[in-house]
């Protein structure tokens, strides 16, 4: 006999359904469930007296015959595509399907079979997102990995060799020997990793050997000399070998201005790091690159969002990160030329317009690896409060803005670096790198992080408790293992045997060339940017871009009292 439940009672039992709205942490952002792929009255809840029992919601189907390895039940699936209530099935460490789980012998509409070999993760009342991707990593210390993972980031891409001064300043792993050693070091780490080689050279041989050694990208950095000749050489190699190029341009304008850099790039695909300029780049107008169709522009999180403390913090960070000396006037002038409140304020608005496509960290080199997700949503909240609803929103929700911002650290960096076939969204066939959130802690403290379908870290209580009681905090789990994750290599490196013998999944990057701003999901705006060289005021299509610094942010102190 059927029973009618109030919307509130249904949500409390089975999680939100179509039309229900969810507040993200303590922000002003509300997402609304757009569709529900489960069937009312046929929900598969696990537990004593519940549905997932033998002969009820659990079938007799073997794994060989198609039963899932794991089913996440009743979650709100949230990625750039939308917000959907669904069950999610996992097999072989990848997403097998999104739909209705259960027993086809007793239930209608089952698309994901629960069998005796199926594990259940209860997702009712939880939000499920893709694992985040941070594509601006200085590999300074291995302890960064846990800070990223416990924040919900499951893929790291960048360069370095440890706390060498080249790595402290630049995201490059220089040369085949260092690349091989870093691949070995990363084999035991529980996150997906891609290594970037050094791209600063005027002849191709030294770049080609790095790509053959497994580098999945090449990085041009001003501290190594980002000259027009180096830019052209690096992009020529990248086009031939299908790897991405990231660029940190010439702050001092010694070898040319932004126009000269764009001429050297010559319409080819390039990922422009911290395109606002506080992290480095042609002063004061590197931000003009956000309007170029071949440029994939990203931000790093120290300027996200613009607050009353942003300017003061940056000057000290910059002196340390780039090995500068306060006793040298030229070094002080170099630092001050990069920190401009006008362009940082404009960066907030350009993110909200979808002109900046990616947010990353710049880990330990001005940015915080564990705050990519937090600072993305703080930026979204600041813009919601200051600019109101986006023009394209429908209904009483912030779905469009939420989808735009989640794309900045999931699908767009994955597209930019040729790995979107494997990570970046919740779709069948992709790796089961997933993050489960309680809505109250969304973006701040994940409840559970899966890597390759295994629970890697989770909120866990006292291991000696009779039940998992306080103190509860994020701890490594059984899936916190190198074999759960993957290494992303160049195709040339994979064919040359780079990474062989490491006991790790090896995946080649692909289709990194010939893409552009139009491929950046929900973040493909290309306004014409003008920067006043005297006042640093920024205009987009003639409109002045300015906003006040935030004096208070969500997702901050109240979440970190303990």
UniProtKB/Swiss-Prot annotation:
Pathway: Nitrogen metabolism; urea degradation; CO(2) and NH(3) from urea (urease route): step 1/1. One of its GO terms (cellular component) is cytoplasm. Carboxylation allows a single lysine to coordinate two nickel ions. Ni(2+) 2 binds at residues 219, 248, 274. The active site is at 322 (proton donor). It is found in: Cytoplasm. Its EC number is 3.5.1.5. It catalyses: urea + 2 H2O + H(+) = hydrogencarbonate + 2 NH4(+). InterPro entries: Amidohydro-rel, Metal-dep_hydrolase_composite, Metal_Hydrolase, Urease_alpha_N_dom, Urease_alpha_subunit, Urease_AS, Urease_asu, Urease_asu_c. It is an enzyme of class 3 (hydrolase). Disulfide bonds: none annotated. Residues 131-562 form the Urease domain. Gene3D superfamilies: Metal-dependent hydrolases (3.20.20.140), Urease, subunit C, domain 1 (2.30.40.10). Signal peptide: none annotated. Its cofactor is Ni cation. The keyword Hydrolase applies. The keyword Metal-binding applies. GO terms for biological process: urea catabolic process. Keywords: Cytoplasm, Hydrolase, Metal-binding, Nickel. One of its GO terms (molecular function) is urease activity. Belongs to the metallo-dependent hydrolases superfamily. Urease alpha subunit family. PANTHER family: UREASE. NCBIfam families: PRK13207.1 (NF009686), urease_alph (TIGR01792). This is Urease subunit alpha. It comes from Paracoccus denitrificans (strain Pd 1222).
